[in-house]
Amino acid sequence: MKKIFFSALCAFTFFSASAQSNFDIGRQTSVDAFSRRNTELYREGRTNTEKYEKAIGSAYTNEKFTLATISGVPEAVSVRYNAEADSFEVQNNETNAPADKKFFALPKQTEYSNIDFKNGTYKFRLLNYKDVNDKEVNGYLIEKFSKNDVVLYKKEKINYIKGRVAENSYAMDSPAKLVRAKDEFYLQLKSKQIVEFPKNKKKLIALFEDKKEAINTYLKTNDPSFSDENDMAKIAEFVSTL
C-alpha cells in the first residue's frame, strides 16, 4: 500500500471510482488522510490560488520544489511551502499530468506533521500555537534550535493584499500584491507551551521569574540581541539549561 502513495494521492484528487472503492475513509493506512473529504477541502484551497495569477509577487519564499521527507510517508517527495496559505504542496511526478494537477496540497494532519528538507535547509513542524495576535493557529513553524524540549521556531509569512479598482478615470487600478511579512519567532518551553519569543529582558524574566538572577547574569555577560536570529538561538540554548 505504501508503495502507491502518489497513485493514491492522485486518485483521490481526481475522485476516481477506483479511489472511492479502494480507500474508504475508515481504513487505517498511510494514505488514509487523503480521503474524499480532505481532497474536497484541499481542492478548494488549490482553486483559491487562482487569486495569485494577477498578483505582483510570489506566495512562496522559494518557488522551486525541494526533495523532503514527511512523517507518515515512506518515500521522499518534492514539496514547496506556500507562505501565504500556510500550506505544503506535493509535486505530482506522473507523466503527462495536466497543468492544473501538477501538485497536490498536503493535509494538515498529525501523521504528516514533520517535514524535513533533504538539503538540510528547513525543518517544518505542524503545530498548534497562539500567534503574535493571540489567535489560535494550526500551522507550520520552522525549527531553528532544539535542546532539552526547548525549541526556537521561525514563521515565514507572505501577505496577500487585494487590488483596488480605480474610482475614476483620473486614477489607476492598483493590482493585488503578495508581500513578504516580517518573520515571527516563537519559543517552545519545557512545558511544551509555545509562546512568542520574548522581545526584551523584562519579557524573558516574566517567563522564568524564579530564574531572574541567572537570566540577569547571562544577559550581562553575553549581551545578546533579542532581534537577531543567531542570538535568539543562543538565548534559547540558555533557556534549555534553566
Please provide the spans of the model-predicted regions.
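Bacterial Sec-dependent N-terminal signal peptides
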Residues: M1-D24, I235
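Sec-dependent signal peptide cleavage junction
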Residues: S18-Y52
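Exposed alpha-helical structural elements
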Residues: T29, K102-A105, T110, K203, ...
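A glycine-rich, acidic short-motif signal
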Residues: T49-Y60, T69
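N-proximal short alpha-helices
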Residues: E50, K177, Q188, L204-F208
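Aromatic-patch recognition
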Residues: A59, T66-E196
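Long, compositionally biased interface segments
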Residues: V195-L242
